[in-house]
Amino acid sequence: MSTIADSKNHGHQKLTAAGLLISLGIIYGDIGTSPLYVMKAIAGGNVISENLILGGLSCVFWTITLQTTIKYVIITLRADNKGEGGIFSLFALIRRRNPNLVWPAMIGGAAMLADGIITPPISVSSAVEGLLIFNKDIPTIPIVLAIIVMLFMIQRFGTNIVGKFFGPIMFIWFAMLATLGLSQLMGNFYVLKAINPMYAFNLLTQYTTVDDKSGFWLLGAVFLCTTGAEALYSDLGHCGRPNIRISWIFVKLALLINYFGQGAWILQNKGYVIKGNPFFGIMPEWFIVYGIIIATMAAIIASQAMISGSYTLISEALRLNLWPKVRVKYPSVKKGQLFIPSINLLLLAGCIFVVLWFGESSAMEGAYGLAINITFLMTTILLAYYLLIIKRISFIWVGLLILMYLIIEVSFLVANLEKFFHGGYFTLISSGILAFIMIIWYTAHRIKRRLTEYVKIQDYFPLIKELSEDTSIPKYSTHLIYLTGADNYTQIESKVIYSIFQKQPKRADIYWFLHIDVVDEPYTMEYKVRTMLADDVIRIDFKLGFRVEHRINLFFRKVVEDMVNNKEVDFTSRYTSLNKRNVIGDFRFVVLEKHLSNDNDLSVMEQFAMDWYFFLKHISISESSAFGLDTSSVTVEKVPMVISPMEAFQLKRVY
């Protein structure tokens, strides 16, 4: 097995000062901007009381501790796939053991993608709305839209230049959070007693809101403090476990100090209903302008992190056959830097709709959190299987741990569902549409693979040999290349044989069959060459990690160069005139695009799935583009795909 390129992960896996700074800039944008709206959402329109604020602070403290620190930082970060994290990386680790786990992986991935639509609007809106302190008539929506549109427009150029400033800016942001919070805690350290979980218990069981609802429903607002926890796991490959864990100590302290500082400020208004945002309320008047600027920059960085995470999520889904083929661009040579135009447009349209539909950040709070809550639950399910089967931890310990988190996350989900008619419907519908696309694509792919007919390639060697030497047939190409999905190297799809011999006899000097195996390791790039029939049939098996772009044209040329240098096969043209010049000859790829034939008897569900599959395939990019093939050397052939052939029938001839 030969290696195409270095397959090691190039992330910042070691603990370094640079790695810590990069972690601040890449990972903590979402969870780091939560203080902009969490305490505001908890206080809501309720009369301020110690039961409400201390109970809310207690819930925030224990949510961050249990969900973010213990579940993600301590436990889930250990479930890395060769240094990579995220829900699809976790699924790739266990998919061979239980393929059915693809369902929670798809649901969780779709929900996380939907969360990427709501994060930029609520983060940027919360920051920009600080301007209302100076003038309540300032139109914030145009400002928010301008920032979001500009953010999405620069994606195609990459984020290398501005990315260098993300870490320092987020360091300033967290330092500001801690300083502002500490300024309010001075002389009000009594609020720290909220660390006692009894305050949280009393809020959830005894408190009644202004709407005569149980305090339990405030969990929907509390959950906003941990919505960025999944990013710690998703961006594991960029920063490394040591850098994330150490930097989290600083981030968690800054967040908690700010939350408790806001709580102390709010309690100064005991007996009243507060107006405005307590985040800006704890700022000295002279600092508000600077605070708004820093908050806006932090919100932009949070949005950028979510956008980049969405690109990575889709690129992984593409390799795992969970998403229609879309064009992926690489604006820089830096590993992990990618740009997906269709997803960029989808997210931009979604963000603009959210801003125009909801208007204010307070109205968006109802839509925020529900989707990522679903991702949390799906990650818990996958994590349980990983701990049991891969790590072989005792069933009792895993059962108790997962039961605790299922209770916590289901409680959050129930509370978040209460916000369905206040914006939650948007994220549920968005998640549902994205999950539907993934499920249709995956289901159709399974149907196609299950019903694809394979034949023994050795049975056709004599015919291939004769065709290659038959000078009465015009030579189609010197080298003819087919992509095959046959895992067994002794087999080939019957459609390939149909293309070579029946559709139009294709004479060539050498027939190549390329097979791509997407492996669980993220950055593997290896290949194996098998000479099936000397000087006539060669098969190449590529083993590519699920994060590797399928640049088959480039990879194939690399293999050819290696084989020529090793003198494994004679590639010089068999045309006499070209052979004198030592010319290798031409290469032509044949891509077979299957279409649904009329000769089928599909079930209702299969017909539904295949109809949607071909619709999605029609609006996605072609197979040749997806595999990075040079269109000038590609022939696309349409071949019928007979699914569930109709039963035999009798046709009577009359005279």
Curated annotation (Swiss-Prot):
Keyword annotations: Cell inner membrane, Cell membrane, Ion transport, Membrane, Potassium, Potassium transport, Symport, Transmembrane, Transmembrane helix, Transport
Q: Which GO terms describe its cellular component?
A: plasma membrane
- Location(s) in or outside the cell: Cell inner membrane
Chief site of localization: membrane
**How does this protein lie in the membrane?**
Multi-pass membrane protein
Q: Gene name on record?
A: kup
Catalytic activity as recorded in UniProt: K(+)(in) + H(+)(in) = K(+)(out) + H(+)(out)
Q: Has keyword Membrane?
A: yes
**What's the family?**
Belongs to the HAK/KUP transporter (TC 2.A.72) family.
Organism, scientific name = Cytophaga hutchinsonii (strain ATCC 33406 / DSM 1761 / CIP 103989 / NBRC 15051 / NCIMB 9469 / D465)
Q: Specify one Pfam family.
A: K_trans
Q: Which residues cross the membrane?
A: 19-39, 42-62, 102-122, 132-152, 161-181, 214-234, 246-266, 282-302, 338-358, 370-390, 395-415, 420-440
Protein's recorded name: Probable potassium transport system protein Kup
Q: Name one GO molecular function term.
A: symporter activity
Role of this protein = Transport of potassium into the cell. Likely operates as a K(+):H(+) symporter.
